[in-house]
Amino acid sequence: PATRRHIAVWQHFLDILAENNVPIPTFPIWAMEFGATYDYKGRAPYFQTRKQLEGKRGNFGQPIRGNSKDDYLFCLPIYAQDNPCKRLSDQDRKFSFPDWKIQYITQNRKFYQDHQNILQEWMQEIQQSGFENSHQKFEWNCGFEEHPDIYTKIIQFRASGIRVKLPTYSPALVLNTTQIPIIPWIVTPKGERGRYMTRREAAKLQCMDDLHEIPDTIAKAFRAFGNAVNVEVVKRIADNL
């Protein structure tokens, strides 16, 4: 139910843009940046003083408040809270966000600044209880559509956000069962719209639909098919050796 609700919220987002003739952003949408004003260029928030963070706004434009530096950081989007240098060697330390993250934040803030008048109502929806951080990020990889419709696409819930692609494409099959592709146009026997890709469909993607036996759990099956090579691809290579 939560997954379907989150998909519906993002469909509403697309509807709002279409109704107002606003193109869908080509960059990943990070809704948590809508209304945020914390400094992100130069030193990352982790290295800023409390004084630098005071009076600014963090997640979804909420005021940065608290009794400690940790409290202040907790008010920021989760990807802005940590030490960006913890995976770097001493000589590579920059104390700042990588360029790609700075670019995404800049793009999202400008997008919201330009269109906040049409997104105010929707902002309440995306902040509903039960929305995971990654579900508040969204990537539309389907190009221009006059009336964009998530329910005719392939959806994948990833750690980096909800990714939507044309139905002619299937995301990589991985072990993590939360990232199994969703086929939203199929109606289940219970009358619900949308379901996850089945083990048999995953086998067919790898041209293994003639298999008599498939691993008996979703996790095992997708791990096996994700680590496999497409049978037809191997056959064509072998035919040309």
Give short role names for the model-derived ranges.
Residues A36-L241:
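C-terminal target-recognition/interaction regions appended to catalytic cores
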Residues P1-G58, P63:
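Flexible, glycine-/basic-rich loop-and-beta segments that form/coincide
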